[in-house]
Structures are given as C-alpha cells and as structure tokens.
C-alpha cells in the first residue's frame, strides 16, 4: 500500500481513550476552549498532536517513524464545571520525546507552537506530572531546605527578608547602608529588587562590594548569619556567571536570578554553579503573571513552580494570600506544598491534577512577598509554616522611625507569633491580640502597628479554581 496523502482528523490518530498511562509518561492537563463547531475530542487530539509528533497533513516520513512509540495521546477529556465550552484534556507524552535535564526542551514541546493553534480559542496548561525517570535527569535545587537551615543555623521559624526600596535610583553606598540597617535590626536576608541588574546609577560590582560590607558588619554585631540576595541576572549567560563568581569570591552565602526573564537554560547553568560552589540561589518570578494570570490561556504558576524545582532554585516567590499580589489560599498552598514536599497526592480542591513523587529532589522555600506588613504576620506564620521566607519591603523600610526599627518590628512580630503558635494558641483567631500584646513591650512594633492598621489590598482573585 502506497503512502496516502491528504488531511485527516487528528482524533483518528491522537485521541485514545483506552490508553493506559505509563509510569514514565509525562502527563499534562490542558484547559481547552475550542472554536465553535470543533468537537472536544478533535480539539484534545489536536493539542496532543501539535505538541508532539503531528502536523496538519499526512507526511511521507510518517511511514519511517514509529508513531505508536513517539506520539502524544489525548487519553481523557472532562468538562469544566460551570463553563459551557471548556474542558480539561489529559495528554500523555512518551519520555523519549524530551531531552534529559532540559526544562527548555520540555517546554518547547509541551507549550510551544500549540498555543497559537487556530482551532482553539484558548489553551491553558493547568498541571504536569513529571515522572521519576525524567526528574532524576535533573540536579534540581542547588541545596534545598535542610541544607539552607544548616548553613544559616536558623531553625524552628520562617526566615525574614526585605527588598530594598526604592527599587531603582539609589547609589551603591546608600543601598549598602539600607542593607546594613535592615540586617542589623534583625532580618535574616535583604534582597536586590528583580530589576536591579547593573544600571548607570549603580553598577553591579559596586553594589556587590557595599552589600558584602554591610552584611559582614551586621553579622559581626548580631552574631547571626546574614544574607543579601545579590542579583546576578544579566544580558548574557557569561556576564551572569561573572557576577555569580564575584559573589562567591566575596564569600557571601546567596545570589539571585530572575528565572523567567533570564530563561531556563541560564537558570539551570547558574543552579549547577551554585551547587558546585556552595551558594544558595534565590529565584524571582518576574514576568510570571504575563503567562499565568489569565484563567483561560497560558500556563498555571504551579507548572512554572515545578519547572523551577527541576531547573534549580532554593527560594521562589509564591504569592502571599494576604498582600497586594494575586494568590488564592487553597491554590497557593497547593503549589507551595508542591515546592517543599517530597511526595504530593492529587487534590483537585487545591488545583493539583496529578500525584507527584519528587523522589528526594531537594525542596524549595516559598517566599511570600508583596504588600505585607506586621498585621499580616500571624496569618503568614499560620499559612506558610516554618519552611518559608517572609519578605517585607515597604513593610520594613516604610517604618516611621527608619529601616532598623522597621526590621526590629518585623522580627519581634515574628518571634511573638512563633512563640504563641508553639504554646498552642490559634493564630487565625487571636492574631491581632498576639501582635498587640507584643507591641506593649516593643515600641518599634507599636509604631508599625499604628502606621499600617488600616491598609488592605482587597480585590477578588482573577484565577479561581
């Protein structure tokens, strides 16, 4: 029988409802909104085809390929509750389609061309199941949660951070001064803002030197190990590595990278360097909302979070649930646990579509940051637990008495919440009272409580289940 040219329906080849998924398959859950008149099976099959071996017409070289071995398969379709023309298409990809240890290649296939596909009005990748066989080809986070605690000698509480503001325009010397004041006041970390790279007002080398000086001075005075996330993100990979190497030569404990704008290839290289050289790696997710904010199109942040755990990072920003940026409680907690835990059961109420076994890939500390202040401390301590970093930028530097008292207020509030929790008190119910009690013996905290007593960022979340 000769080669049969022509166009045939995707569903004839790529829709296989009786397929049993393998332990080695990468599984994806897509939220599909087809164009009017396109049946769900055809749309789901089209997604499977276009993100694996298919093209729009039958080609001669199909005959010299083992399609059964390499094609993606749409194996299940379910309607989305409350949405008329939307459904979840589950697609299984054979492991052989992906290069080992490359998040870049995985995303190029799964979320590459298919998102521009005309037969679909919109497409969103809701979740991925990474099989053990694939996750074992990645190094993952440079160090992980336990190693970080051991390096910093800090146990039994969340870590405290602060992003130095104004984010742009400070000179290196003044920037270092702000870093020193915050660390001296009781914070564990300070942070470069994500867009501080190496601009005319502050070149990277000057910033690194002044921040290192600030950090060593604060360390000597407090007897605690301190860190400042030195942002190594740069225009080229070579320049990024140069900055990371300089940070290591200064002896600082941690560097930082913007993993979405910097790219997964650069991020994975940096993560490998960090593990080899004992640097912790803080990851900022600038640009994530471009990809994950729309409910119908793009990619959910939980997928970006899984990708980061593979690519490598010790901290990642994960929303606050209570501050100024997007994040619903159950959904946020779903991907927070997914970042920290070794094994995670499927749980649709938290947006988790697949059971994920990370087989001892190190965990990532979630970072809560964005519009939070001392009144949020009980809620944050309860929601995120000990394994997290709570970052107060304006909530430290906006203190009426200055940066160091702002840091003191946050540290006192945190220690009060941790102590109350350990005594068995209910942080959700008694939170305000716990903060008020602590403020009685901390004038710095009392002043902070007064400034921010009315501030709220109450808008409904865009991305609901």
UniProtKB/Swiss-Prot annotation:
InterPro entries per the UniProt record, alphabetical: RuBisCO (IPR033966), RuBisCo_large_chain_AS (IPR020878), RuBisCO_lsu_C (IPR000685), RuBisCO_lsu_C_sf (IPR036376), RuBisCO_lsu_fd_N (IPR017443), RuBisCO_lsu_N_sf (IPR036422), RuBisCO_lsuI (IPR020888)
EC numbers, comma separated: 4.1.1.39
Group of enzyme by EC: lyase
Site (described: Transition state stabilizer): 324
Record-listed substrate binding positions: 113, 163, 167, 285, 317, 369
Active-site residue list: 165, 284
Processing and modification events after translation: The disulfide bond which can form in the large chain dimeric partners within the hexadecamer appears to be associated with oxidative stress and protein turnover.
Binding-site list for Mg(2+): 191, 193-194
Cofactors required: Mg(2+)
Keyword Glycoprotein annotated: no
GO biological process: photorespiration; reductive pentose-phosphate cycle
NCBIfam families assigned to the protein according to its UniProt record, in alphabetical order: PRK04208.1
Additional note from the record: The basic functional RuBisCO is composed of a large chain homodimer in a 'head-to-tail' conformation. In form I RuBisCO this homodimer is arranged in a barrel-like tetramer with the small subunits forming a tetrameric 'cap' on each end of the 'barrel'.
Stated family: Belongs to the RuBisCO large chain family. Type I subfamily.
Name of the featured protein: Ribulose bisphosphate carboxylase large chain
UniProt organism field: Casuarina equisetifolia
